[in-house]
Regions:
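Hydrophobic alpha-helical connector segments
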Residues: 57, 71-102, 156-160, 204
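Amphipathic alpha-helical segments used for helix-helix packing
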Residues: 83, 98-119
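Helix-turn-helix
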Residues: 11, 19-53, 57
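Amphipathic alpha-helical packing segments from all-alpha helical-bundle domains
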Residues: 82-85, 118-144, 155-158, 182-185
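N-terminal intrinsically disordered/low-complexity leader segments
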Residues: 1-7, 149, 195-217
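Amphipathic C-terminal alpha-helical segment
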Residues: 94, 141, 161-178, 190-199
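Hydrophobic alpha-helical segments that form the core
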Residues: 102, 107, 151-170, 182-190
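Generic hydrophobic, amphipathic alpha-helix propensity
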Residues: 8-17, 33-34, 58-62, 66, ...
Length: 217
C-alpha cells in the first residue's frame, strides 16, 4: 500500500537531484533514491514514474535552477569581463566548498548517458547552448567596452563552455584553489582580457606622467 502524498513533490525532487548529482544514474539504486527523498517506493513510482522518468525530471529541475542561476550570473554585470570573473569565481568556490565538488549534473550525464540515450542528450544540448549564448553575450559586452580586443570572436564562447566542462570533470579529483584559478586566468587571458588591461594601465601611467607639473629647478 502506497504512502499518502503528504509531501511537496518539488522539494523531494530536489533531493533526487542531489542523489543523482552525487552518484549518477547507474550509481543510484531505487532503494537509495527512496531513502534520499524520504518517500516509499509506491509514492515515488506514483508521483515521478520509473527511475529514468525520475532522472529526466531531476535533470530538468537542475537545469531550471542550478544551471539557470549560473547562466543569469553572466548577464548581471554591465562589464562583460566582470561577469565572466564572477561566473568562474562562483564555479571555483562551488567546487572547493559546495555541491560542485560532485561536478555538474549536466556534465556528469553527458559522460554517463549521452551516447546511449538520445532523448536525454537532446535536453543536455539545450543546456549547453544556453550557456554558450550567455558566454557570447558577456564576450560581446566586453568587446564593446574595450575590455578585450575588438576582434575577439564570439565563437570563443564555445571555448569557455569547454573550459567549464573540463573544470566540472576536474572537480571530482579535489583540485586546489591555485590550480582552478590558474585555469580561469589562462582562459580569460586567451580572450585578451589581461593584454587589454595591461595596455590600459600603461596608457594611464603615461597620461599621468604627462600632466604632472615640472618642479622648479
Amino acid at each position: 500500500m502506497g504512502q499518502a502524498k503528504q509531501f511537496d513533490p518539488r522539494e523531494r525532487l530536489d533531493h533526487a537531484v542531489d542523489a543523482f548529482w552525487e552518484n549518477g544514474f547507474d550509481g543510484s539504486a531505487m532503494q537509495a533514491l527512496c531513502k534520499a527523498m524520504g518517500i516509499f517506493p509506491g509514492s515515488l513510482y506514483g508521483t515521478y514514474g520509473d527511475k529514468r522518468q525520475l532522472f529526466v525530471q531531476a535533470v530538468e529541475r537542475y537545469m531550471a535552477t542550478v544551471s539557470a542561476e549560473a547562466v543569469e550570473t553572466l548577464a548581471r554585470d554591465a562589464s562583460g569581463v566582470a561577469a565572466l570573473r564572477r561566473y568562474f569565481g562562483n564555479l571555483v568556490d562551488g567546487i572547493l566548498g559546495g555541491k560542485r565538488q560532485w561536478g555538474c549534473l549536466v556534465t556528469n550525464t553527458i559522460v554517463e548517458l549521452a551516447q546511449r540515450d538520445p532523448d536525454i542528450r537532446a535536453k543536455l544540448d539545450i543546456g549547453l547552448a544556453r550557456l554558450e549564448t550567455a558566454f557570447a553575450g558577456a564576450i560581446a559586452r566586453a568587446r564593446q567596452a574595450g575590455e578585450i580586443p575588438g576582434d575577439t570572436s564570439l565563437d570563443s564562447a564555445a571555448f569557455l563552455v569547454c573550459v567549464v566542462q573540463g573544470m566540472n570533470v576536474l572537480a571530482k579529483t579535489r583540485p586546489s584553489r591555485q590550480r582552478l584559478e590558474s585555469i580561469v586566468a589562462t582562459a580569460l587571458a586567451a580572450l585578451g582580457a589581461d593584454r587589454v588591461a595591461s595596455t590600459n594601465h600603461r596608457k594611464s601611467v603615461t597620461t599621468a606622467a604627462m600632466i604632472v607639473p615640472s618642479l622648479p629647478a
